[in-house]
């Protein structure tokens, strides 16, 4: 799962937002970015930043939606009990994956350049992460779930065209397929990551 590291690092850098939500997806991302810069460049202990990140991420990212998508075809064949177990494990996995890399970015600068409504439920916000010392400019596209305009949620982001959700789906499905379709093999991988 190391292939997702850069995506998780970038995701953590921009998931700090206020409890209220902007109705406009571009405004939502701008709000997230502005506050992320303040929090990540502060002198707060890393532990404090992680607590804030996890609390806010649960409100600004559709973790459950991403988790069910990453199960792919298996979400239709597993029992409700296994589905519930997976959702809990994925949430813990997801939060630990990016919060543990919080310190990788201290003052991200990102500019929202455009947005495009692709359906009644989704809007894509296009942005650029400015180049910094040792880091090139990066194109980031945010997939915002806007079915409830009062509470838009991040459901995916594409870094230079690479989708976080799709990449995770491929990795999870590979684990299950390589273990004869046994969902418990994925549970084991997630549990090992969470406790290490």
Predicted regions mapped to residue ranges:
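Sec/Tat signal peptide C-region and signal peptidase I cleavage site
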Residues: 17-22
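Bacterial N-terminal signal peptides that target proteins for export
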Residues: 1-7
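Bacterial N-terminal signal peptides
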Residues: 7-15
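Surface-exposed, charged secondary-structure patches
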Residues: 96-138, 189, 193-196
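A mature extracytoplasmic/lumenal domain signature
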Residues: 70, 90, 114-116, 128-131, ...
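Early exported N-terminus immediately downstream of N-terminal targeting peptides
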Residues: 24-102
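Short beta-strand edge/turn micro-motifs at domain boundaries
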Residues: 137-166
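Low-complexity, intrinsically disordered terminal/linker segments enriched in charged
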Residues: 156-196
């Amino acid at each position: 799962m190391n292939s997702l590291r850069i995506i998780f690092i970038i995701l953590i850098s921009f998931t700090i937002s206020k409890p209220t939500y902007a109705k406009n997806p571009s405004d939502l991302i701008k709000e997230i970015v502005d506050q992320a810069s303040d929090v990540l460049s502060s002198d707060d202990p890393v532990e404090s930043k992680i607590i804030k990140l996890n609390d806010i991420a649960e409100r600004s990212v559709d973790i459950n939606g991403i988790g069910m998508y990453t199960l792919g075809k298996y979400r239709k064949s597993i029992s409700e009990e296994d589905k519930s177990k997976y959702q809990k494990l994925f949430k813990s996995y997801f939060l630990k994956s990016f919060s543990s890399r919080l310190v990788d970015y201290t003052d991200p600068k990102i500019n929202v350049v455009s947005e495009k409504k692709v359906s009644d439920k989704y809007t894509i916000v296009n942005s650029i992460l400015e180049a910094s010392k040792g880091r090139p400019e990066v194109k980031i596209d945010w997939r915002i779930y806007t079915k409830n305009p009062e509470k838009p949620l991040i459901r995916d982001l594409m870094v230079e065209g690479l989708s976080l959700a799709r990449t995770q789906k491929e990795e999870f499905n590979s684990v299950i397929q390589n273990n004869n379709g046994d969902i418990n093999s994925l549970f084991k991988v997630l549990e090992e990551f969470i406790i290490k």
